[in-house]
From Swiss-Prot:
Pathway: Amino-acid biosynthesis; L-arginine biosynthesis [regulation]. InterPro entries: Arg_repress, Arg_repress_C, Arg_repress_C_sf, Arg_repress_DNA-bd, WH-like_DNA-bd_sf, WH_DNA-bd_sf. Pfam families: Arg_repressor, Arg_repressor_C. It comes from the Bacteria. This is Arginine repressor.
Length: 156
């Protein structure tokens, strides 16, 4: 029984790591799992798990080749929070750019527009999976970036 519970914890941790879309090698996944207390994990076990769950290497929003789960495993459900649709948030001197799951950009942009100027949002432009948003007067792009990060509980 204990072994089965430990296996479920391993699978849950493994899937959570892949959803982060930042691991470019099996060795990095092994180290991350070991850091979480799964001491007897090794590269061959990670390789079998990647195959079992259909994980693939693809480019993330930062154009890095990383392991991720296929889209059908990451499809949002009625109980999943909106923050799960936000994949990446970045900014430059003019705008904040938000990358979302395919098809989610307009929903997230509408949410941001509803917050309005009081929260520092002058407006948004959304495509299928990318949003440009610009700060209102009195706010810097960095202020807006940090506010959006906080809204979607992303790490700096």
């Amino acid at each position: 029984m204990r072994s089965s519970a430990k296996q479920e914890e391993l699978v849950k941790a493994f899937k959570a790591l892949l959803k982060e879309e930042k691991f470019s090698s099996q060795g990095e996944i092994v180290l991350a799992l070991q850091d979480q207390g799964f001491d007897n994990i090794n590269q061959s076990k990670v390789s079998r798990m990647l195959t079992k769950f259909g994980a693939v290497r693809t480019r993330n929003a930062k154009m890095e080749m990383v392991y991720c789960l296929p889209a059908e495993l990451g499809v949002p459900t009625t109980s999943s929070p909106l923050k799960n649709l936000v994949l990446d948030i970045d900014y430059n001197d003019a705008v904040v750019v938000i990358h979302t799951s395919p098809g989610a950009a307009q929903l997230i942009a509408r949410l941001l527009d509803s917050l309005g100027k009081a929260e520092g949002i002058l407006g948004t432009i959304a495509g299928d999976d990318t949003i440009f948003t610009t700060p209102a007067n009195g706010f810097t792009v960095k202020d807006l970036y940090e506010a959006i990060l906080e809204l979607f509980e992303q790490e700096l």
